[in-house]
A protein has these predicted regions:
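Generic long, charged, amphipathic alpha-helical segments
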Residues: 486-521
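Catalytic alpha/beta core domains of metabolic enzymes, predominantly
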Residues: 214-217, 224-342
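Active-site beta-loop-alpha junctions enriched in small/polar residues
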Residues: 47, 82-84, 108-114, 140-142, ...
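N-terminal capping/small domains of soluble enzymes
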Residues: 6-7, 11-12, 30-117, 361-370, ...
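Alpha/beta enzyme core
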Residues: 51-76, 94-100, 114-235, 253-258
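A mid-to-C-terminal "edge-of-domain" accessory segment
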Residues: 35-39, 45, 284, 290-459, ...
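Mixed-charge, glycine-accented linear interaction segment located at domain edges/termini
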Residues: 523-555
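Short beta-alpha connecting loops at secondary-structure transitions
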Residues: 210-212, 264-272, 284-296, 356-363, ...
Length: 555
């Protein structure tokens, strides 16, 4: 069947004029005209992102994230599906009370039900009730879904698309049509896929967005199909990709290269299955690498902050290996790499980390060279250069310690102490002369007790403290003993404690070495220290002593 030749009158009824694109005011302000070469960013973190495992937002959370995205300059923020749950209805009510400076809030929904007029479809009416300037609806492109999921005819599916969009345009909404399974549908039946997209365009859709819903399309295929859509459609074309084969961002870039002017995605790549197009990658790729107008460079400098903020609100541990904004995105470990970066930064960096609000990090390990030590020490405020006589000693000591099981990549407090002691710039603030840890109680209740004896100059202190466990008891006893000499320790707290058993496959469980990493804070800063020993108490004590000594060194 030649769907492309079906007359416009068939979609809207005989004698009904095709709706014209509307210049809409009100409902959040004037719609901006699409600038030449502008690629608009459409964020769906609050809807599609929450379909990812472990991702959930309260109404208050959604409003906070939306406001952050608005400040960042995202062009559209999809708030949710008002027909699906009370939470999203409440979000849209609250969003309507706010003034949005840069973004337009979008409500999301589907085409009308089969054999029901759009004006009578409750879900479609709720999209109008949301009072957003933009409505995004999805419809079927793939005949498999039309016949087996919707269980309707190809003709009725096209009518559902056209009728819904026409109704929304009549109600003065900007309409973005998400062509679900657009790429798989086109590969299955190009003629029918194009007919659905043209139906959306003729009904007045401002955008037809090609969705790689299953996330399995290759960039070359995306490029080819996007180019065809651009040739066949006069409205704007967008792209919505999923990351099932790790190509969501690459596919979005391919679409933009072929003329797509809207990219949909989520912050940090949240989304169903393996996630959506990660906007923290796509945005700098489009703006900085491709040189396209999108989010301004001044705002992209806040991208790392935006990424961390959304993770924090979602209560998700940040992905340190995330491109551009991750903690290791600009981290250098290999000695030859660091030596080159020390001379010419871009010799091993694709971009200046500050353009996205990130920073360069130099890691120190058994792979380190002299340049690693120098740059890391300078980063920590220690005066040192390649000609410092003690540099060889420091490097040897680091490699020996790493061989014993120490890991200084995440324990910069202990590393700073090692370097300063090797340089002769640290004098012991105290000496631990003795300690004892014991546990008493029965099967139902027990108490850990730690006793320590410390010397500061010619004075000694001998204290006892109870704790929830041996490490907590030691921490309390040490700070109690030293507080009289160093009041600054009053604010120091142990905030995290991690244990890793080393070389357990080559030794019995009791003989294996234990590495302890401690996070401490004084309510202003955080620092990390490490200890290694076959005895977990000894390893913990090393890390605790380094933690206290590092804080006193800062004083």
């Amino acid at each position: 069947m030649n769907y492309s030749t079906w007359p416009s009158a068939w979609f809207f009824g005989a004698g009904v004029a095709r709706p014209q694109a509307l210049e809409i005011t009100g409902l959040g302000g004037n719609f901006r005209p699409l600038m030449k070469n502008l690629v608009e960013i459409y964020d769906t973190t609050l809807r599609d992102g929450t379909q990812g495992e472990g991702v959930s937002f309260s109404v208050a959370d959604k409003l906070r994230v939306a406001e952050k995205l608005d400040a960042f300059g995202v062009h559209y923020v999809e708030g949710g599906w008002p027909g699906s749950n009370p939470k999203d209805i409440e979000f849209f009510k609250e969003a309507a009370k706010r003034k949005w400076r840069n973004t337009q809030i979008a409500a999301f929904g589907s085409t009308r039900r089969k054999k029901v007029a759009a004006k009578d479809d409750q879900q479609v009416k709720l999209l109008i009730d949301a009072e957003t300037p933009v409505v995004t609806i999805f419809g079927k492109t793939w005949l498999l879904h039309v016949r087996e999921v919707l269980r309707t005819t190809p003709k009725e599916n096209i009518a559902m698309i056209a009728d819904t969009i026409a109704f929304l345009k009549k109600n003065k909404r900007k309409v973005i049509y998400d062509a679900e399974h657009a790429l798989d549908g086109y590969k299955d039946d190009p003629e029918y896929a194009l007919a659905t997209w043209k139906a959306a365009e003729e009904a007045g859709a401002d955008f037809v967005v090609l969705c790689d819903t299953n996330g399995g399309t290759l960039p070359s295929e995306v490029a080819e199909i996007t180019a065809i859509a651009k040739k066949e459609l006069s409205c704007q074309v967008g792209i919505h990709t999923h990351n099932d084969i790790g190509l969501a961002v690459a596919n979005a870039v391919s679409a933009v290269e072929q003329g797509a002017t809207q990219v949909q995605g989520t912050i940090n790549g949240y989304g169903e299955r393996t996630g959506n197009c990660n906007l923290t990658c796509a945005i700098p790729n489009i703006s900085l690498k491709m040189g396209r107008r999108s989010i301004t460079k001044s705002r992209i400098k806040k991208l790392s902050d935006l990424s961390r903020f959304v993770d924090e609100v979602a209560n998700i541990i940040p992905n340190r290996r995330q491109p551009w904004v991750g903690g290791t995105a600009f981290a250098h470990k290999g000695g030859m790499h660091v030596n080159a970066v020390q001379k010419v930064a871009h010799s091993f960096e694709h971009a200046d980390p500050t353009v996205v609000g990130n920073k360069r990090r130099i890691l120190v390990s058994d792979l380190a060279g002299r340049s690693n030590i120098v740059m890391k020490a300078q980063e920590m405020g220690i005066r040192i250069n390649n000609d410092t006589p003690e540099l060889k000693t420091i490097l040897t000591k680091v490699k020996e310690q790493e061989h014993l099981g120490y890991d200084y990549e995440g324990a910069e407090g202990s590393l700073a102490l090692l370097i300063r002691k090797s340089l002769g710039r640290v004098y012991p603030a105290f000496d631990l002369e003795a300690y004892h840890v014991s546990m008493r109680g029965d099967a139902l209740e027990h108490v850990c007790e730690a006793t320590v004896k410390v010397r500061v100059g010619d004075k000694t202190a001998h204290t006892v403290a109870d704790g929830d466990g041996p490490v907590n008891a030691l921490d309390q006893a040490l700070r109690n003993a030293l507080r009289g000499f160093y009041p600054v320790l009053e604010m120091v707290r142990l905030t995290d404690y991690k244990v890793r058993i080393l070389n357990s496959s080559r030794a019995s469980g009791t003989a294996a070495k234990t590495r302890v990493l401690i996070e401490s804070t004084d309510c202003k800063e955080r620092w990390y220290t490490v200890g290694v020993n076959e005895n977990i108490i000894e390893a913990s004590l090393q890390a605790l002593l380094d933690s206290i000594e590092f804080r006193l060194l800062k004083k």
